[in-house]
UniProtKB/Swiss-Prot annotation:
Modified residues (N6-succinyllysine): 64
One Gene Ontology CC term in the entry: respiratory chain complex I
Gene Ontology biological process: aerobic respiration; blastocyst hatching; mitochondrial electron transport, NADH to ubiquinone; proton motive force-driven mitochondrial ATP synthesis
Family, per entry: Belongs to the complex I NDUFA2 subunit family.
Alphabetized InterPro entries for the sequence: NADH_Ub_cplx-1_asu_su-2, Ribosomal_mL43/mS25/NADH_DH, Thioredoxin-like_sf
Source organism superkingdom: Eukaryota
Protein name, as recorded: NADH dehydrogenase [ubiquinone] 1 alpha subcomplex subunit 2
Name of the gene: NDUFA2
UniProtKB keywords: Acetylation, Disulfide bond, Electron transport, Membrane, Mitochondrion, Mitochondrion inner membrane, Primary mitochondrial disease, Respiratory chain, Transport
Sites bearing N6-acetyllysine, chain numbering: 64
Length: 99
């Protein structure tokens, strides 16, 4: 799982500085992201206490996963209509450098 991958320091080797998750509080397209946060955020944060993991809610925003690396480099992955499991896989890909 993403928490296990991050706890092995995989993201740290890539210079990962921060994870941000943007989502809408109400839209159906963000439901999987809301489910992911509800079910897996605590485990992920416990496995990565030094990595900032920010949750940003905003009305009518398209859900996205943002990763900020060293030197200000950023990547993002659209999460629209993803299930919680698909969000987990997207996060694992970011942590392993495949995103």
């Amino acid at each position: 799982m993403a928490a296990a991958a991050a706890s092995r320091g995989v993201g740290a080797k890539l210079g990962l500085r921060e994870i941000r998750i943007h989502l809408c509080q109400r839209s159906p397209g963000s439901q999987g992201v809301r489910d992911f946060i509800e079910k897996r955020y605590v485990e992920l944060k416990k496995a990565n206490p030094d990595l900032p993991i920010l949750i940003r809610e905003c009305s009518d925003v398209q859900p996205k996963l943002w990763a900020r690396y060293a030197f200000g480099q950023e990547t993002n992955v659209p999460l629209n209509n993803f299930s919680a499991d698909q969000v987990t896989r997207a996060l694992e890909n970011v942590l392993s450098g495949k995103a």
